[in-house]
A protein has these predicted regions:
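Alpha-helical transmembrane segments of multi-pass membrane proteins
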Residues: 55-60, 125-138, 201
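Membrane-water interface of transmembrane alpha-helices in multipass transporters/channels
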Residues: 77-92, 154-166, 194, 223
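Re-entrant/interfacial helical elements at transmembrane boundaries that shape
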Residues: 90-93, 104-115, 183-187, 198-199, ...
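Non-transmembrane, extramembrane segments of multi-pass ion/lipid transporters
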Residues: 19-53, 104-128, 184-190
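Cytosolic regulatory modules rich in charged/polar residues
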Residues: 2-92
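Transmembrane helix-loop junctions at the membrane interface of multipass transporters and ion channels
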Residues: 77-81, 150-157, 182-189, 214-223
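Alpha-helical transmembrane segments in multi-pass membrane proteins
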Residues: 63-68, 91, 95, 99, ...
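Nucleotide-binding motor/catalytic cores of P-loop/tubulin-like NTPases across gene-expression machines
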Residues: 82-87, 174-184, 194-195, 213
Length: 223
């Protein structure tokens, strides 16, 4: 019949379930590699040579190492503040880790939403407003818990504890906004949003956190 002829004529091939699963696995592997700052590879781990593993990792590691020098520059620029209140140094790792974790959570959520079609680039204002409100709640919770720890367990003076906790709130807010912003920008520029994942977000957030920390310390502690 004419309908059968049309069906036969339009049929150009068959995609099996195995082919579909293989494609999904390849896409997932590529995204995981990008989200961990590695070049993607279509080969299984044990079938990649040492040279291939090196090529997939070294360029990103070099880029992130160079990027992290900005954090060192910030610390050197505020050596006077650290010298005046040396206890500030002890809380730098906690602040940068909190910022990196908050930014990574936001980025992962946005990237997944974009992957399943739940989020579009034109949703950016709504994304930022939503992330801002969530960040206030998360940052406030962390700051309250941390303030109690600093006062009652660490024996830190209230002014220094206030500096650390205010920085913590600001860091979480900035980190989640950055984490929500970068994947959308990447999508608009036709880059893979997965590139804007944990390692890159952490590098950006580290520098931002240090700038906020030392400036709040200078204002509140008069140093």
């Amino acid at each position: 019949s004419r309908g059968s002829e049309m069906c036969i004529r339009d049929r150009v091939g068959i995609v099996t379930i195995d082919d579909a699963i293989s494609i999904m696995q390849d896409e997932a592997s590529e995204d995981i590699a990008k989200m961990n700052a590695m070049g993607p590879s279509d080969k299984p781990y044990f079938k990649q040579s040492m040279w291939e593993l090196y090529k997939n990792r070294a360029p990103w590691l070099l880029f992130l190492m160079i990027s992290s020098t900005f954090s060192s520059m910030v610390i050197r620029g505020y050596e006077d503040a650290l010298a005046a209140v040396t206890v500030l140094t002890a809380y730098i790792p906690m602040l940068t880790d909190a910022g990196g974790n908050a930014g990574s959570q936001s980025t992962s959520t946005i990237i997944r939403g974009m992957a399943v079609g739940d989020i579009e680039p034109h949703d950016l204002p709504k994304i930022l407003w939503r992330e801002f409100r969530v960040a206030i709640l998360c940052g406030g919770t962390l700051a309250l818990c941390n303030f109690a720890k600093l006062i009652f367990l660490d024996g830190i003076t209230p002014p220094v504890a206030a500096v650390v906790c205010l920085t913590l709130i600001c860091t979480v807010i900035l980190s989640q906004l950055i984490g929500g912003l970068l994947p959308v920008i990447a999508e608009k520029l036709n880059f893979d949003p997965a590139v804007m994942a944990s390692p890159l977000i952490t590098t950006i957030v580290d520098t931002t956190t240090l700038l906020v920390y030392f400036n709040i310390a200078r204002v509140l502690l008069k140093i």
